[in-house]
UniProtKB/Swiss-Prot annotation:
Protein name per Swiss-Prot or TrEMBL: Glutaredoxin-2
Boundaries of every Glutaredoxin domain copy: 6-106
Gene designation: grx2
Species, as recorded: Schizosaccharomyces pombe (strain 972 / ATCC 24843) (Fission yeast)
Keyword Cell membrane: no
Disulfide bond entries: C26-C29
């Protein structure tokens, strides 16, 4: 893990309402991005298999979140988990509320 990877992740999650660290070939990543698109979530996806330092970024994400797989999804600076966690939020109705709060620029998301 490099300080470049740490800086990249921290800047990404600070600058985007929703950040998804993904891999282009991952079906769970695709499903998560499809869900976020369906709910009109303002998200930015970073394809770790397509960007420089992708493996270092994934190593830092593992250190930060204790999750070694992708997708890694953040709402503002709050790690919410992967696709199954996103689906739990969707099923409970919480995802709709979280996205509405993001769009209203509320600072409290969860």
């Amino acid at each position: 893990m490099t300080s470049i990877a740490k800086a990249f992740v921290e800047k990404a999650i600070s600058n985007n309402p929703v950040t998804v660290f993904s891999k282009s070939f991952c079906p769970f990543c695709k499903a998560a991005k499809n869900t976020l698109t369906k709910y009109s979530a303002p998200y930015k996806a970073y394809e770790l298999d397509k960007i420089e330092n992708g493996s270092d970024i994934q190593a830092y994400l593992h250190e930060k979140t204790k999750q070694s797989t992708v997708p890694s999804i953040f709402f503002r600076n709050q790690f919410i988990g992967g696709n199954s966690d996103l689906n739990k939020l969707r099923s409970s109705g919480t995802l709709t509320k979280m996205i509405a709060e993001l769009k209203e620029n509320k600072s409290s998301i969860l």
